[in-house]
Amino acid sequence: MRMIVSDSHIFWRTAATAALFALNGCASQNSVRPYPAQTPNAQYANGTTGPLGYNNHVPDFASRNFEPFNRQDVAAIALREWRMFGSPVSDDDPEDRPEPTDPALKPERIPGLWQRIGEYWWIGQDPYETEVAWTGKTDAGGTRFDAAHDGHYAWSAAFISYVMRVAGANDRFPYSPNHATYINAAASGQSSGVSAHDPGSYTPKMGDLICVGRGRSKSVTFSMLPTSYGFPAHCGIVAAVNQNAQPFGHELSIVGGNVDDAVSLTHVPTDANGRIADGSGHSYDSRYPWCAVLEVHYDADQEPDSGL
């Protein structure tokens, strides 16, 4: 069953976390870069990257870090995109979600939103990748693809990459159209900006990513990482932690792209300490056998002058 919740509901559920950030004090503001940061022009599944260069797809406020790269901005950007898609909540088992019979019912293809997904690709991906010109319903040549084949244009990793890019991660995130690229980069230590943790031994924080294998790769566990191959996966951005509410009691909230063809919020069960798996790594979530928590290394918890 799908639910729609109000913005105020999410606000109150995240207020306690925001207050903790305020009590912890504010990080000093980084100096604004005089020029945009250089990032790899391409990043590959084996961990190698292309040459560094300026990416003119990325706004100056992000590439020059008008604010330090921080957790608050990542969660806020993810929640902004969620509201744009109508604030859907996807708490049912993905195996029980039938595909819409009418392509017009797919949020990713409706006016205003298919273009937004194009922005996720354009900004989030490295500039020389073919995918930068994709949208929610067209390929790089502008040809509308059949809705039945939209799995070939899956945009959930593009959404994650977009949020990190716009928040000012610059060269500290392995942007990719595939979640496995940054899961493996974090697990292998090839990315200095992201570390991978066993879900049974690390408590997710706001702005971290929690990840799971999909389909034939649902059996991937933390002990198998990094893999020597790419694999289908999904990651969501932790938008709220330490929640005690329906439907699970102890829970956290994640925001992910391409969930039911939209940006959706999902509640994830935790234990009383906020972890998503027990000490052996067994997920508390019967829907998702989480394989990793990706800790993103931010400059700050929040904007120095955010007012919170």
Question: Which functions belong to the PLM regions below?
Answer:
Residues 253, 258-308:
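Low-complexity, Gly/Ser/Thr/Pro-rich intrinsically disordered linker/tail segments
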Residues 90-93, 174-176, 222-223, 265-267:
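Short, solvent-exposed loop/turn and secondary-structure capping segments
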Residues 2-15:
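Bacterial N-terminal signal peptides that target proteins for export
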Residues 84-90, 168-172, 217-219, 262:
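Secretory-pathway/luminal and periplasmic proteins that interact with or process carbohydrate-rich
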Residues 36-167, 305-308:
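N-terminal capping segments
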Residues 27-29:
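Bacterial signal peptide processing site
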Residues 172-260:
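...with weaker cross-activation on analogous glycine-rich loops/strands in unrelated enzymes
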